[in-house]
């Protein structure tokens, strides 16, 4: 379970940097702040039903700090992590190079699509995610995301639309310790 949550959190971070015409031009002012995970598709069933807004901070060295809280089985799980940039614009590596993250700019303003694949704690995964600056559902962005998902080899029928929550208030709360990149 912890590995799955880390996968989701690391994939979210991938949205934050890209520099050529096929990706989003990076600008610290555009990315630090609040983002919303609107939808995701994975090969495996994801037990997340609610998410808080992501708080993102682009660090001076280009690395990114991300904090998000997921509601899983009526419990809150807070994840804060640092993701290191690579030499390839819009791509990141995590978990000692075993996890690859890629950003795709959506044609819908304020939306980005993420493709994540790799291995975390022995668990292989493949996932796409749709994030945006506001919590409202955008059907145009969602339709584009479904096409993106199919191009990346996933089945759009596995789409999960996530419920947004401002603050997690479950019966219990669990915080994962920060896990620095190496």
Curated annotation (Swiss-Prot):
Residues 1-18 form the signal peptide. GO terms for cellular component: extracellular region. Glycans are attached at residue 30. It comes from the Eukaryota. It is found in: Secreted. Belongs to the calycin superfamily. Lipocalin family. This is Vomeronasal secretory protein 1. InterPro entries: Calycin, Lipocalin, Lipocln_cytosolic_FA-bd_dom, von_Ebner_gland. It holds the Pfam family Lipocalin. Keywords: Disulfide bond, Glycoprotein, Pheromone-binding, Secreted, Signal, Transport. The lineage of its organism: Eukaryota, Metazoa, Chordata, Craniata, Vertebrata. Specifically expressed in vomeronasal and posterior glands of the nasal septum, the ducts of which open into the lumen of the vomeronasal organ. The keyword Signal applies. Disulfide bonds join 76-168. One of its GO terms (molecular function) is pheromone binding. PANTHER family: LIPOCALIN, VOMERONASAL SECRETORY PROTEIN 1. Transport of lipophilic molecules, possible pheromone-carrier.
């Amino acid at each position: 379970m912890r590995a799955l949550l880390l996968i989701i959190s690391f994939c979210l971070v991938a949205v934050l940097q890209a520099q050529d015409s096929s990706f989003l031009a990076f600008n610290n002012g555009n990315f630090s702040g609040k983002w919303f995970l609107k939808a995701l598709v994975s090969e495996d069933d994801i037990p997340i039903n609610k998410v808080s807004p992501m708080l993102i901070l682009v660090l001076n060295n280009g690395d990114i700090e991300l904090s998000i809280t997921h509601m899983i089985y009526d419990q809150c799980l807070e994840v804060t992590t640092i993701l290191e940039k690579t030499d390839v614009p819009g791509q990141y590596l995590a978990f000692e190079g075993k996890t690859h993250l890629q950003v795709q700019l959506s044609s819908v303003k304020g939306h980005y699509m993420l493709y994540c694949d790799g291995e975390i704690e022995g668990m292989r995964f493949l996932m796409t995610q749709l994030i945006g600056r506001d919590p409202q559902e955008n059907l145009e962005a969602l339709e584009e995301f479904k096409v993106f998902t199919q191009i990346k080899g996933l089945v759009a029928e596995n789409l999960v639309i996530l419920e947004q929550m401002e603050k997690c208030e479950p019966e219990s709360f669990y915080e994962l310790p920060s896990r620095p990149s190496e």
